[in-house]
Amino acid sequence: MVVIQGKGGKADPRVIGKDEEHQKSIVKLSQIKKIMKDRTRMRISKDALVAVSACVMYLISEITDGAKNVASTDGKKKVMPKHINNAICNDTELHFVGHDWLIKNGGMKSYIAPGDFAVSSKKGSSRD
């Protein structure tokens, strides 16, 4: 007679906590899955969800870091929407990604393309 013994009871909370620390994220994978599935009408793998989550976390960290720097240069201790807008406009890569983002109470976008000054000076000199 062979008796098979299995682990009974609840799982050890110390072991579960260590595994979940690496997967913890601000953005839930289920939310990303719902958005991607609604837009693509395809099945989404877990690796794709983790990759998109990492990209979103990177963008959030870049925007918050830039907004913190803008707020500190203004002498403020509180990050406001205008600081986020200025951070996106001042960073070339973030501006390339988010040039059409509208941030409520963010003020006007103050990005001037490098070629804008050259074009305006040529127009003024051709009138003579």
UniProtKB/Swiss-Prot annotation:
<dbReference type="GO" id="GO:0046982">
    <property type="term" value="F:protein heterodimerization activity"/>
</dbReference>
<dbReference type="GO" id="GO:0003677">
    <property type="term" value="F:DNA binding"/>
</dbReference>
<dbReference type="InterPro" id="IPR003958">
    <property type="entry name" value="CBFA_NFYB_domain"/>
</dbReference>
<comment type="subunit">
    <text>The nucleosome is a histone octamer containing two molecules each of H2A, H2B, H3 and H4 assembled in one H3-H4 heterotetramer and two H2A-H2B heterodimers. The octamer wraps approximately 147 bp of DNA.</text>
</comment>
<keyword id="KW-0539">Nucleus</keyword>
<keyword id="KW-0238">DNA-binding</keyword>
<dbReference type="InterPro" id="IPR009072">
    <property type="entry name" value="Histone-fold"/>
</dbReference>
<protein>
    <recommendedName>
        <fullName>Histone H2A</fullName>
    </recommendedName>
</protein>
<keyword id="KW-0158">Chromosome</keyword>
<comment type="similarity">
    <text>Belongs to the histone H2A family.</text>
</comment>
<keyword id="KW-0544">Nucleosome core</keyword>
<dbReference type="GO" id="GO:0000786">
    <property type="term" value="C:nucleosome"/>
</dbReference>
<dbReference type="Pfam" id="PF00808">
    <property type="entry name" value="CBFD_NFYB_HMF"/>
</dbReference>
<comment type="function">
    <text>Core component of nucleosome. Nucleosomes wrap and compact DNA into chromatin, limiting DNA accessibility to the cellular machineries which require DNA as a template. Histones thereby play a central role in transcription regulation, DNA repair, DNA replication and chromosomal stability. DNA accessibility is regulated via a complex set of post-translational modifications of histones, also called histone code, and nucleosome remodeling.</text>
</comment>
<dbReference type="GO" id="GO:0005634">
    <property type="term" value="C:nucleus"/>
</dbReference>
